[in-house]
Swiss-Prot record:
The keyword Lyase does not apply. Keywords: Amino-acid biosynthesis, ATP-binding, Cytoplasm, Kinase, Nucleotide-binding, Proline biosynthesis, Transferase. ATP binds at K18, S177, D178, T218, G219, G220, M221, A222, S223, K224. It catalyses: L-glutamate + ATP = L-glutamyl 5-phosphate + ADP. This is Glutamate 5-kinase. Its EC number is 2.7.2.11. It comes from the Bacteria. GO terms for cellular component: cytosol. The gene is proB. One of its GO terms (biological process) is L-proline biosynthetic process. Pathway: Amino-acid biosynthesis; L-proline biosynthesis; L-glutamate 5-semialdehyde from L-glutamate: step 1/2.
Length: 368
């Protein structure tokens, strides 16, 4: 009997497909519209079988290198953003032309980490992608490199694809790149590197050494593994497969490494708190509060707080840290930082009536 986790990929009715930069370029780094068209063929076959697909496509910077007369991928931010602004046009035009052969229309959705982090923008992006699918258009998502700052070096869209997968309620995430799957070491450097066909828990990752990205993109194995684990933890199974085998990956999931999803899908709010929202500050907890919050899933009371850091307001997301400064949870705080600074360490009975709510309610708290 085949793997039930691969079966989950194969039978998924809604899939996010992430296409990495190296899947869209020649070995010398030149953007290759022909390779993109081949991937579109494989994706079209899956859609023709009745699956909704959203594409997260890297490659804007790479697509802008040749038109701007650059000899290699730029290193400075301004030139990266200039290349992205030129390359994004070529990238979307190529996807549009590829799917036009099948009578399909594409829609471009450019996001930054900030868009995903802010609840209103997060919801707007979700509605846009849902409406594109309802109108039978193919959503092409990319990071908005022309306005991103440090995000432009952030995972070659690996993390973004995991966030989008949960955002649209996808049944599966397929990561396509030049990587065969997960190994316990770099197979290009170590002949005895062991291929890992399935990851069902932390024990499967013992001894795994993940490398960084290529000169063409920014998403190395570390980024892909982290993003796959993020999606799987949220309840979305993931297949990490080579773009050269896209047809097999999207047809029967017989290639690459599959990451098993947790049995219960994380709610949209808890996912946003845990993974998408930007932290506005932190609270340091004593040992008793850590046990209550993490071990017993109880609300955080002011009495268990020993330090307040950051300028945050009620409704913001903050990190909850143990006495050793290790983050143990994240949550939506009920008070401003200035209020909590006067409340911390005090029992509820000592506080005025209007300040007797938990600092972070259990319903707004997610252990990490």
């Amino acid at each position: 009997m085949g793997s039930p986790h691969r079966e989950a990929i194969r039978t998924a009715r809604s899939v996010v497909v992430k296409v990495g930069t190296t899947a869209l370029t020649t070995p010398s780094g030149v953007f290759d519209a022909g390779r993109l068209a081949e991937l579109a063929d494989a994706i079209e076959s899956r859609m023709k079988a009745g699956t909704d697909v959203v594409i997260v496509s890297s490659g804007a910077i790479a697509a802008g290198i040749e038109p701007l007369g650059l000899s290699r991928r730029p290193k400075d931010l301004a030139t990266k953003q200039a290349a992205a602004s030129v390359g994004q046009v070529a990238l979307v035009n190529s996807w549009s032309a590829a799917f036009a052969r099948y009578g399909r229309t594409v829609g471009q959705v450019l996001l930054t980490a900030h868009d995903i982090a802010m609840r209103v923008q997060h919801s707007n992006a979700q509605r846009t992608l849902d409406r594109l699918r309802a109108l039978h258009a193919v959503g092409i998502v990319n990071e908005n490199d022309t306005v991103a700052t440090n995000e432009i070096r952030f995972g070659d869209n690996d993390r973004l694809s995991a966030l989008v997968a949960h955002l649209v309620g996808a049944d599966a995430l397929v990561l396509l790149s030049d990587i065969d799957g997960l190994y316990d070491a770099d197979p290009g450097k170590f002949q005895n590197a062991r291929f890992i066909p399935e990851v069902s828990g932390p024990a499967d990752l013992d001894g795994v050494v993940a490398g960084q990205g290529s000169h063409l993109g920014t998403g190395g194995m570390a980024s892909k593994m982290s993003s796959a684990l993020l999606a799987a933890d949220a309840g979305v199974p993931v297949l990490l497969a080579p773009a050269a085998d896209a047809a097999a990956a999207l047809t029967d999931a017989s290639v690459g490494t599959v990451f098993a999803a947790r049995s219960e899908r994380m709610s949209a709010r808890r996912f946003w708190v845990r993974y998408a929202a930007e932290s506005a500050g932190s609270l340091t907890l004593d040992e008793g509060a850590v046990r209550a919050v993490v071990g017993h899933r109880r609300s955080l009371l002011p009495a268990g707080i020993t330090a307040v850091a950051g300028k945050f307001f009620g409704g913001d997301v903050v990190d909850l840290c143990g006495p050793d400064a290790t983050m143990v949870a994240r949550g939506v705080v009920a008070y401003d930082a200035t209020e909590l600074a006067t409340m911390m360490g005090r029992s509820t009975s000592e506080l005025p009536g209007e300040l007797r709510r938990p600092a972070v309610h259990a319903d707004d708290l997610v252990a990490v």
